[in-house]
Amino acid sequence: MIKTSWEGNCFLNFFNNKVSLGNVDKTIFKSKSTSPYKLLKSTHDQEGRCILPVLHTAGGLVGGDLLVFEVNLEKNSKVLLTTSSAQKVYGSVGISKINPKGSFSKQKNLINILDNSHLEYLPQETIIFANGLYEQIFKVSISETSSFLFTDLIRLGRSSSGESIESGVFRSRLEIIRNNDLLDDWEYVDQIELSKASFVAKSGMDYMPVFGSLIWICEKDFSKSKINNLVRKIKKIFNKTNNNLSIGILENGISVRFLGSSSQDARKCFFRIWKQIRSVSGFCEPKYQGVWPLQDSMNY
C-alpha cells in the first residue's frame, strides 16, 4: 500500500560550547531530522544566542500526517527557534470516500530545558483551511533556573477568500512541568479546541478568525515586582490596538490571549510584548527575523 501521509521527525540538541564571544558564550547544536523538516542556516546574536529557523518542505499538512519535534537545551544555553513560513493544514473532512469524517494531522512537541537555559519558541502562524483537522501537543520540562517563551498564532480559514473553518477543528494541549530536586511540579496546563461552533459563538470568537496565545514561564526566583511592572507595560500595548487582548499573571510568568481579524496585528502585538520580556529579563533587544513576513518589518 502506498503511504500518502508524512511521518517526520526532528531532534535538536543545543549546548554551550564555552567559546567566548567577547564576554558571552556561544550556543551551538547538533541535529537529526527527516523530511519534511529542513533546518535553515543558524545565526547568533551578541549574547551568543542560537537563532535557528525551521522549514516544513512539504508546504502543508493533510489528514494522517504525524510530526515529532524534540528540543533539548543543555545547561547555560540560549536559543531562539522560529519557522520560515506559516504552517498550512489542508481540508480532510469529506475528501475521502473511505474516511468521509477525515483524519487529524498531528504534531507532538517534546521540549526539555536544563539549568540556566532560555528557550524562545516563536513559530509563524498556523492556518486551518476549510475542513482541516489539526492536533498539537506540547510537553515541556523546565528547570527552576530556566525560562520558556512560546507564541501560538492560529487563523481559522482564509478570510480573504471568504473561507471559514467549516467542519475543521484545531486542538492544542500545552503541559509545562517544573523540575526540582525532590519532585516535579505542574507549572502550567492549557487545553484549547477551536471549531465552527466556537468561531460563531458570541461568547467565543464571534467571527474573528485569528486567535493567539503567548506564554512566558520565568525562573522560579524571578522578581514578582518585575513581573508586575511587565504587566503594566503590556497593558499599555493593549491600549494601542483595537483587538481583544487579555493577560493573566501565573505563579511564575504570564499568559496573554489575542483575538482579532488580523494576523499582522497579532504578530506586531506579540513582538512588542517580546521586547518587554527581553528587557525585564536583562537580555538584549530582539530583532525582526529575516524569515518573517517582509511587510511586517517596517512596522515594528
Curated annotation (Swiss-Prot):
GO cellular component terms, semicolon-separated = cytoplasm
Compartments (UniProt record): Cytoplasm
**What InterPro entries does the record tag this protein with?**
UreD
Keyword annotations from UniProtKB, A to Z: Chaperone, Cytoplasm, Nickel insertion
Q: Does the keyword Transport apply?
A: no
Q: Which GO terms describe its molecular function?
A: nickel cation binding
The record's annotation in Pfam families points to: UreD
Give the protein's biological function.
Required for maturation of urease via the functional incorporation of the urease nickel metallocenter.
What the record says about family reads: Belongs to the UreD family.
Query: How does this polypeptide assemble, per the annotation?
Result: UreD, UreF and UreG form a complex that acts as a GTP-hydrolysis-dependent molecular chaperone, activating the urease apoprotein by helping to assemble the nickel containing metallocenter of UreC. The UreE protein probably delivers the nickel.
Protein name per its UniProtKB record: Urease accessory protein UreD
Q: Which organism is it from?
A: Prochlorococcus marinus (strain AS9601)
